[in-house]
């Protein structure tokens, strides 16, 4: 009798896992509670909806996530395929039209002969082979089930989404088109600030009213998606070294570097919507409007979606998962996505790719699949299952620091990254022959 796998959650990780299984002839029940039950952060019933930024970050091989994307591309990732098809201008980054992106994935999976989509809320983990990819907004009932099988308490922090604005309402006389250091095409609209303008903005942020947080939830932020008001609380200069960093963004009108810069990134294929880069926030909507109007060029801006903030949940993976994203105590259960402690869209999808390929091989009797540590995919899997500081385990992005050192030391960082990237792709090429 043919084995059927239950994949719970049709986000980035669940969609990727389901696709990898189905492409290898395995029958999949893809279980997604939306639209029967919505979450505080999702806006549609589409699979792999991007609820934070529309950027999948850097695309170059001198960037950790760029290497990860290229590895996935060579392994026929549905997420990367969709991103390449839905790409919008973003300099050296891979940004997408979020509607085209999730629409392509949804249609591909719904029409796959080996995938059955079930729209219902799951409150108990099914018997048999199961991949849990329920993401940051796992329901309380299912979260308790996960606590029961892992024996670990849940940890919480907040992901935050930036506001999206209409391009037509931007005062184009006050902004300029440029990518940092002129890398790639000029893809960002830049709002330059003088020191006085920045100080007024900064003071307003500190005084702005924050939306209330449930008392039972611990505030624990991951640095990669921190609310800008929390960054501001760390000191007046923090934003200047973060999302408002002016380095490499000289104003072509003056030839000089502004004191601070707010960047706007295209959010849709038509180029009518832009998001405010790095301005993920938990401010009340009225406060967001007042603060944003202090940014030069955005004085009369129309906000089409305010920033929101939502809980995230992840398990203490080094204690409970192996490199195949299997639950050590119950190997028929796998986890994928942010719940495993990988952080980021691409990283989440990569964990689903590993879980899906591994489970397909297990069912087909082909043996286990452990990616080489020299690959970015393998290094992420190794990190979540072997992190040394497992008493304070934190989510991790793809980065070159996760890869083993090169045999020959290279001082120049760019050259070192290029060498590590080439080695990763060489290892993947050889490893792929075993799949």
UniProtKB/Swiss-Prot annotation:
What top-level branch of life does the organism fall under?
Answer: Bacteria
Keyword terms of this UniProt record: Cytoplasm, FAD, Flavoprotein, Methyltransferase, NAD, NADP, Transferase, tRNA processing
GO terms of biological process kind: tRNA methylation; tRNA wobble uridine modification
Names of the cofactor(s): FAD
Enumerate the InterPro entries for this protein: FAD/NAD-bd_sf, MnmG-rel, MnmG-rel_CS, MnmG_N, TrmFO
Quote the Gene3D superfamilies the UniProt record gives.
FAD/NAD(P)-binding domain
Q: Where in the cell is it found?
A: Cytoplasm
Listed name of the protein = Methylenetetrahydrofolate--tRNA-(uracil-5-)-methyltransferase TrmFO
- Species per Swiss-Prot/TrEMBL record: Staphylococcus aureus (strain JH9)
| Protein's gene | trmFO
């Amino acid at each position: 009798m043919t084995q059927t796998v239950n994949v719970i959650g049709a986000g980035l990780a669940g969609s990727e896992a389901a696709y990898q299984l189905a492409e290898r002839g395995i029958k999949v029940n893809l279980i997604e509670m939306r639209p029967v039950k919505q979450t505080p952060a999702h806006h549609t019933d589409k699979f792999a909806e991007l609820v934070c930024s529309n950027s999948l970050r850097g695309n170059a091989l001198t960037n950790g996530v760029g290497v990860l994307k290229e590895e996935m591309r060579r392994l026929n990732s549905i997420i990367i395929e969709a991103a390449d098809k839905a790409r919008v201008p973003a300099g050296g980054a891979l940004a997408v039209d979020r509607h085209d992106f999730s629409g392509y994935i949804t249609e591909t999976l719904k029409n796959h002969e080996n995938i059955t989509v079930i729209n219902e809320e799951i409150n108990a983990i099914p018997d048999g082979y199961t991949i849990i990819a329920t993401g940051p907004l796992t329901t309380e009932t299912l979260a308790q089930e996960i606590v029961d099988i892992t024996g670990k308490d849940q940890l919480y922090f907040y992901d935050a989404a930036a506001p999206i604005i209409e391009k037509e309402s931007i005062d184009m006389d006050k902004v300029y088109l440029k990518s940092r250091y002129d890398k790639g095409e000029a893809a960002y609209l830049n709002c330059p600030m003088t020191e006085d303008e920045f100080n007024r903005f900064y003071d307003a942020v500190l005084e702005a009213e924050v939306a209330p947080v449930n008392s039972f939830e611990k505030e624990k932020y991951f640095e990669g998606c921190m609310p800008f008001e929390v960054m501001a609380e760390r000191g007046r200069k923090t934003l200047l070294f973060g999302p408002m960093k002016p380095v490499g963004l000289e104003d072509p009108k003056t030839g000089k570097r502004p004191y601070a810069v707010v960047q706007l990134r295209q959010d849709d294929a038509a180029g009518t919507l832009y998001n405010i880069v790095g301005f993920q926030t938990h401010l009340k909507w009225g406060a967001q409007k007042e603060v944003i109007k202090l940014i030069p060029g955005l004085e009369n801006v129309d906000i089409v979606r305010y920033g929101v903030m939502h809980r995230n949940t992840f398990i203490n993976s080094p204690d409970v998962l192996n490199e195949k994203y299997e639950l050590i105590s119950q190997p028929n259960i796998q986890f994928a996505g942010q719940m495993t402690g990988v952080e980021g869209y691409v990283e989440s999808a990569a964990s689903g790719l590993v879980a899906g390929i591994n489970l397909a091989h297990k069912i087909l009797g082909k043996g286990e699949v452990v990616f080489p540590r020299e690959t970015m995919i393998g290094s992420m899997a190794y990190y979540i299952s072997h992190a040394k500081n497992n008493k304070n385990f934190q989510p991790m992005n793809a980065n070159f620091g996760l890869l083993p050192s090169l045999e020959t030391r290279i001082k120049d960082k760019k050259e070192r990254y290029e060498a590590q990237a080439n080695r990763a792709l060489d290892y993947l090429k050889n490893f792929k022959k075993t799949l």
